[in-house]
From Swiss-Prot:
One of its GO terms (cellular component) is cytoplasm. Homooctamer. This is Glutamine synthetase nodule isozyme. Keywords: ATP-binding, Cytoplasm, Ligase, Nitrogen fixation, Nucleotide-binding.
Length: 315
């Protein structure tokens, strides 16, 4: 083992009570993740006991240079699978110095919704299926595909095994275990339909915790792919042509939906979703018009539909 590896895996608890806290937040694109670390005097288990921090928002696309201060408010703590010991990962949201949430802080409004007594009483469950693609670093082409070339057509890769069907499993399994270590309610993984494409599932988790767990799971995956020297892509359609895209399918239920007669409650919710389909699509992220074509197990972006076990439906 090299000296560098020794230092990376150094156990600090033998020599100091101090810990390292990695503060994580969503950057200016609304998709990128940023983080920086600080030393704390001892272990912390309650995010309200953590100090607020600041960063240069002009360097993340979240503030102008003449007024660049953005404040990090710690919101959730997870165990750090990289530094281990008592070290922690901290999910933060972002505010102006006067305490107003900045535009990219979507967590603030979500937390208010989930804390409403009527919402909390329904115990909303989320199960999120995050698809992603692993790309070769220098050419931004899926691992398992030669530059400018393609393997055999889709079919054998979904949940596939073997050197000609599954690419990047070491990264996927490392991520799976790291998430379990961190305390994330990760419920599974599988190879997806396109070579180099995988999925992990978070949940069922209640309310705002589902979002916190998804973002930390994404962060951990970014760190692991950084170590492995490959690029993590959440692009909805990373490769054009006859290949599946990647999304974050969201399974959702309330207590009323899970109780007897819940199927009727589900249908009522679907009717409400249909009425605001275009508004919702606009908020689901950029690039979905390239994925939601009515082909490759998707619904057409302009057409709302629902069904049971229908992979070509919106719901």
């Amino acid at each position: 083992m090299s000296l560098l590896s020794d230092l990376i895996n150094l156990n600090l608890s033998d020599t100091t009570e101090k810990i390292i806290a990695e503060y994580i937040w969503v950057g200016g694109s609304g998709v990128d993740l940023r983080s920086k670390a600080r030393t704390l005097s001892g272990p912390v288990n309650d995010p309200s006991k953590l100090p607020k921090w600041n960063y240069d928002g002009s360097s993340t696309g979240q503030a102008p240079g003449k007024d660049s201060e953005v404040i990090l408010w710690p919101q959730a703590i997870f165990k750090d699978p990289f530094r281990r010991g008592n070290n922690i990962l901290v999910i933060c949201d972002t505010y102006t110095p006067s305490g107003k949430p900045i535009p990219t802080n979507k967590r603030h409004a979500a937390a208010k919704i989930f804390s409403h007594p009527d919402v909390a009483a329904e115990e909303p469950w989320f199960g999120i299926e995050q698809e992603y693609t692993l790309l070769q670093k220098d050419i931004h082409w899926p691992i398992g595909m030669a530059l400018g070339g393609f393997p055999g057509p889709q079919g054998p890769y979904y949940c596939g095994t073997g050197a000609e069907k599954a690419f990047g499993r070491d990264i996927v399994d490392s991520h799976y275990k790291a998430c379990l270590y961190a305390g994330i309610n990760i419920s599974g993984i599988n190879a997806e339909v396109m070579p180099g494409q995988w999925e992990f599932q978070v949940g069922p988790s209640i309310g705002i915790s589902a979002g916190d767990e998804l973002w930390v799971a994404r962060y951990i995956l970014e760190r692991i792919t950084e170590i492995a020297g490959v690029v993590l892509s959440l692009d909805p359609k990373p490769i054009p042509g006859d290949w599946n895209g990647a999304g974050a399918h969201t399974n959702y239920s309330t207590k009323s939906m899970r109780n007897d007669g819940g199927y009727e409650v589900i249908k009522q919710a679907i009717e409400k979703l249909e009425k605001r389909h275009n508004e919702h699509i606009a908020a689901y992220g950029e690039g979905n018009e390239r994925r939601l074509t009515g082909r490759h197990e998707t619904a057409d972006i302009s057409t709302f539909s629902w069904g049971v076990a229908n992979r070509g439906a919106s719901i």
